[in-house]
Amino acid sequence: MKFFLDRRKRTLLLFLILSVFCSGCEQKGKEESKEEQWAKGYDLPVEAGKENEVEQECLIVVDRISDIYRYGNKGEGSNIILSDETLERMQEEIGKLGYPVATSEEYCAMVNYEKMDQFLQECIDGKKCSAVLYDLSSSGGISRKEYTFDGSEMYLLSAGVGWDNSYNPIVSYVSYTRIDEWSYTEKGWFCYKLCVPEPPEVSEIVDGSELIRVIPLSEECKVLSEKCVYPLCYMENNILCSNWDTENLRTIDYNAAYEYFYNMKYGERLDPDKYTNGIPAAEFEDVIMKYLPVTAEEIREWAVYDEETQTYAWANLGCGNYTLSYLGTALPEVVDVRENEDGTTTLTVDAVCEMFIADDAMITHELTVDFKEDGSFRYLGNKISDNEIQNIPEYRYRISRR
């Protein structure tokens, strides 16, 4: 009996020792896991009280714009696309609360941008500070972004807000991430890269880059950006991403540029089903000559043209005639305007690229334009800075030239 009791005591003692040991190992494992998580910088833990505070603020703020969203213009398709007017009304309403507010509109002017500018200037000075920004998407989603700088590292506490079927706001997520690197440019762009999972933890590369224009463009630059460069961009034609002038117009990809000039002239996209057998010469040449100083004879010589059918070839963009590049995703932005002695105007344009590189001037080029009194204009040339020409990927013509 005594032996049995001693054995029970020894077993109990051993159990207690193992429990303490395992508990210590578990605690150590949790500490190591927590340290590893903070080292990675993403999916960081959010204090329960802070998370609840953020969620409640989001619901209160976004509830102010629920009627604007509910009755606003959401487009005619199955996917919601809010009109610029609706987005601007939502932006203005939240801005009344004093928050900086941006939207997904190209060349958007941030409301209450002074607060974000002050925050970033204090970060540059090494001061501990924070700022909250609301970001409105044309899809109807709202993001609350709280940036915190501790004097050394910057963090982003982000919350996403959507809508239920009754147009009530619902918080879809709250996340906390360290910002791996950031900068605030002279032009007023806040550029940063978030810490994100990397291979082999994930099978595909995750892009944590983001660009936010804090200091708005001047009204003149905004208008000229919308009128002269945004309709073209860099993806599917070479008007803005190659060197050319009135003495060297043969390198332009006329067959690709046509659909963008068509959109500029008529205010609607080209219907590809209408031109399966090519574009009639008169239509093609009329559109091209409206925006470029070329003759019909020159277009027929330099573009892909069928003399027998008197049509110009056209094809949709696809993997067979386009190579994806960072530049192709960039947003052209007019940053300076110079009036020339001959009456023409030269626009200094920066290619703002968010994808992976977060660069507010991937390339800089000068676009010369001839504006007429009736409001029409022609492009006369484009020159890329000599030290940046190497950043231009080789252009693939939409349709192979013979």
Please give the residue ranges for each predicted region.
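Bacterial N-terminal signal peptides that target proteins for export
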Residues: 2-12
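C-terminal motif of bacterial Sec signal peptides marking the signal peptidase cleavage site
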Residues: 21-24
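Bacterial signal peptide processing site
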Residues: 26-28
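Mature, Sec-exported extracytoplasmic domains of Gram-positive
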Residues: 30-402
